[in-house]
Amino acid sequence: MSLGGASERSVPATKIEITVSCRNLLDLDTFSKSDPMVVLYTQSRASQEWREFGRTEVIDNTLNPDFVRKFVLDYFFEEKQNLRFDVYNVDSKTNISKPKDFLGQAFLALGEVIGGQGSRVERTLTGVPGKKCGTILLTAEELSNCRDIATMQLCANKLDKKDFFGKSDPFLVFYRSNEDGTFTICHKTEVVKNTLNPVWQPFSIPVRALCNGDYDRTVKIDVYDWDRDGSHDFIGEFTTSYRELSKAQNQFTVYEVLNPRKKCKKKKYVNSGTVTLLSFSVDSEFTFVDYIKGGTQLNFTVAIDFTASNGNPLQPTSLHYMSPYQLSAYAMALKAVGEIIQDYDSDKLFPAYGFGAKLPPEGRISHQFPLNNNDEDPNCAGIEGVLESYFQSLRTVQLYGPTYFAPVINQVARAAAKISDGSQYYVLLIITDGVISDMTQTKEAIVSASSLPMSIIIVGVGPAMFEAMEELDGDDVRVSSRGRYAERDIVQFVPFRDYVDRSGNQVLSMARLAKDVLAEIPEQLLSYMRTRDIQPRPPPPANPSPIPAPEQP
């Protein structure tokens, strides 16, 4: 059963406030300095169109403005959120800018601002031929109410009896309302068996997940009777808001559970029971942005499957086939994930390995060879450098086998084991086409890595059945090896074929793939930091570009 019309819209990781300054702008006014204003545009993932998001105020007579009006953006770590900042000289009397008043522009992703040192970046303005346009300075700040965590406990009384041979097995489902009137599921309680008066365990939920920062937004709560076959029986519903829930810090709050169908059919219908909010508290916690702002770097490593089951790279049927018109599935997956994660790595150097190939000249089989053929330094410069090394390896190595994951997992784990202060977190992307040959060793490697600052993303390409991969993705059952369970869930698996867009819109389908494989990374990083009691370091002190001294006459 699908629970109550939940949409697939994700809750933003947080809300980010962008502060804008400019330095050394073009001077277009004859008798005074320019009167600048900045316009922010965001890019639609679907159409790639730029849409105006907002404008700063106009500041008169300056080439070095520090704008007061800020931009507040929803931030999704797992998405490439492209921004464009256009700077204009504005006639302050009419507040109108003309094309000739264009002072320059800058393009960058929101992740680049957050991933900059202290969540600050400075970019050169361009767009006016033959002119130096100056620079734009951007600072990202997380809104404080986005770090709040609500903890609450509820009980119910005299719920409707739904089971023929016993009482109900009730549970609650929480939904956040969206601006378009739909609802998104945001929490489910546990099932309390065989009772009409359940007391549920206390639970915690980010306030942003409950109401997206809008304290008066409707929160709908459905009450269900659990059934083994999944056809859970609807008992009733009630609505509230974060603001109303928070009143329970001082008093119990009782809600009537109403079943609209029963209410219409039965004149004497009163309710289907009541739910009482027993306790409610709010605490703040450190967020993903806190750690990134404090200097935590995401170290991205790539491992690519070079086994023979991929097919001859020279043949169009191969998963590694390099068409002049289209990237291979391997290259598309690598580009989609890497282009987002690189914003959080200051040196943009990425170790990249292959596994399952015979290497020249003697034909040695390797399960962790550097794609750039440099054993001393496997780093590639940027995602383009990784792709270049991958294409070069396809021309020089012989695809072979078997498919071993453990060597490359252990390789990254050895590097992660040297970091214990929260300064670095490792993300390993494995792209593969088939069945793992070293399942036992891979499970052992994952269990060992689960105590380290490390996450593993697996993208399965091709038509193979990936049951073994699903087993490694510990969403339902925690991975175990020799009776030892993984300390944390650190693996995320997705099959590439689920993201092949029949309409041919590769940009959108690869954005969806990146979104799904990266969505769990912030929480996995936070779970590691929490279990080790590692607090984010304070951001480095602000060091803005000084306002140039006025020219001497």
UniProtKB/Swiss-Prot annotation:
Its cofactor is Ca(2+). Residues 1-125, 132-255 form the C2 domain. GO terms for biological process: cell differentiation; cellular response to calcium ion; positive regulation of dendrite extension. Glycans are attached at N95. Residues 299-500 form the VWFA domain. Residues 536-553 have a biased composition (Pro residues). Disulfide bonds: none annotated. Residues 531-553 are annotated as: Disordered. Ca(2+) 1 binds at D163, D169, D225, D227. One of its GO terms (cellular component) is extracellular exosome. CDD domains: C2A_Copine, C2B_Copine, vWA_copine_like. SMART domains: C2, VWA. Keywords: Calcium, Differentiation, Glycoprotein, Metal-binding, Repeat. SUPFAM superfamilies: C2 domain (Calcium/lipid-binding domain, CaLB) (SSF49562), vWA-like (SSF53300). GO terms for molecular function: calcium-dependent phospholipid binding; metal ion binding. It holds the Pfam family C2. Probable calcium-dependent phospholipid-binding protein that may play a role in calcium-mediated intracellular processes. Plays a role in dendrite formation by melanocytes. This is Copine-9.
